[in-house]
């Protein structure tokens, strides 16, 4: 079974569950038609995700953030242009990310307790969305930071059920499902030197020592955990900002310590970028904006003639992914200190402001 773009063989690129979910693209009679459909649907998914995320951060369908965000991300080379050029699945995954957060926050608003969640359609819908996302790309397990924060056991249970069922269907229906364990898992466990901005990939390119790799890995993991800890109180103050920001830092940290980080993964930061519309957000810090600009504008940098500098600039997105959790952790710590020194500056919980 063949897919178009950069992921040429579904069976060799995904788990049995992911293969089942993506395989309908192979039903198109020609590759050119499949490419066109994937590109148009991918663009529609990205625009739809930005529209919904814009509404979530502003509570207005026609907020200026929507056209500005669409224009900016469709103009810059990374991440949208490459996503569409390669006709990969990442635009659809962005839509699943935003839908999941929207459904989870709607469930939170019901206030029925974790047992009552099992009777809510929002929990089932969120679980199905998460189950599909994790089945296609296991890295989307970071989405579960949201139901963890809001004690949404039902969402996790439904997602697990969907993942198990789709994996079982794939295992018994696709050819040679054992290749997932014999080929794909070993391949993903080893960082590759090309098109890989993860710590492992950068280490191969720059010849870093094992000690350097270990130090950067520990720093990234600690920074990601610190970011989540300092953000935790915002889950009640501003659940939208908390959810999009926590997912972004978990994505950034997770990709850097895993075996693969590609620049167009920054597409899943777009909801975080939109939190600039919230009363308080790490996106209000110029250093955060600079880090994200260096991520998306990297391919535009001209060559300097210095091999070392050019190599570092080429891999700038990887360094920015590594820096993002540390930046957010610092922002969160500063907000804690500020609120303790200026009690009147503390923002009331969103639930109180709406009453």
Task: State where each predicted segment sits.
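Flexible gly/pro-rich beta->alpha loop and the following alpha-helix that scaffold active-site loops
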Residues: 326-329
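Primarily membrane-embedded glycan-assembly and transfer machineries that use lipid-linked glycans
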Residues: 1-2, 6-7, 11-124, 153-270, ...
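Active-site oxyanion/phosphate-handling segment shared across diverse enzymes
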Residues: 292-295
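Membrane-interface alpha helices of multi-pass inner-membrane proteins
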Residues: 122-138, 142-147, 249-256
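Short, well-ordered alpha-helices that flank and scaffold nucleotide-derived cofactor binding pockets
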Residues: 150
């Amino acid at each position: 079974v063949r897919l178009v773009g950069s992921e040429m063989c579904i069976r060799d690129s995904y788990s049995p569950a992911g293969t089942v979910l993506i395989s309908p693209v192979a039903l198109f009679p020609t590759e050119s038609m499949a490419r066109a459909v994937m590109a148009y649907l991918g663009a529609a998914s990205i625009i739809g995700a930005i529209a919904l995320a814009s509404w979530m951060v502003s509570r207005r369908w026609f907020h200026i953030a929507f056209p500005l965000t669409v224009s900016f991300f469709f103009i810059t080379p990374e991440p949208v242009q490459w996503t569409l050029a390669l006709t990969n699945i990442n635009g659809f995954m962005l839509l699943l990310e935003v839908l999941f957060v929207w459904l989870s926050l709607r469930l939170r608003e019901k206030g029925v307790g974790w047992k009552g969640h099992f009777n809510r359609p929002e929990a089932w819908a969120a679980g199905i969305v998460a189950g599909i996302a994790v089945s296609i790309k296991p890295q989307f397990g970071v989405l579960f930071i949201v139901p963890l924060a809001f004690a949404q056991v039902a969402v996790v249970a439904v997602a697990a059920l969907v993942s198990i069922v789709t994996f079982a269907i794939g295992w018994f229906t696709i050819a040679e499902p054992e290749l997932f364990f014999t080929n794909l898992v070993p391949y993903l466990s080893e960082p590759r030197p090309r098109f890989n901005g993860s710590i492992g990939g950068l280490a191969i390119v720059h010849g870093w020592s094992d000690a350097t790799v270990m130090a950067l890995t520990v720093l990234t993991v600690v920074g990601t955990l610190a970011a989540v800890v300092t953000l935790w109180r915002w889950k009640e103050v501003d659940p939208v900002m908390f959810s999009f920001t926590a997912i972004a830092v978990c994505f950034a940290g997770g990709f850097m310590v895993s075996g693969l980080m590609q620049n167009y993964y920054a597409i899943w930061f777009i909801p975080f970028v939109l939190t600039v519309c919230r009363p308080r957000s790490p996106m209000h810090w110029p250093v955060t904006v600079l880090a994200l600009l260096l991520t998306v504008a990297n391919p535009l940098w001209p060559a300097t003639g210095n091999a070392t500098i050019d190599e570092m600039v080429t891999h700038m997105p990887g360094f920015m992914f590594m820096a993002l959790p540390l930046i957010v952790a610092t922002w969160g710590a500063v907000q804690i200190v500020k609120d303790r020194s200026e009690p009147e500056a503390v923002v009331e919980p969103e639930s109180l402001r709406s009453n």
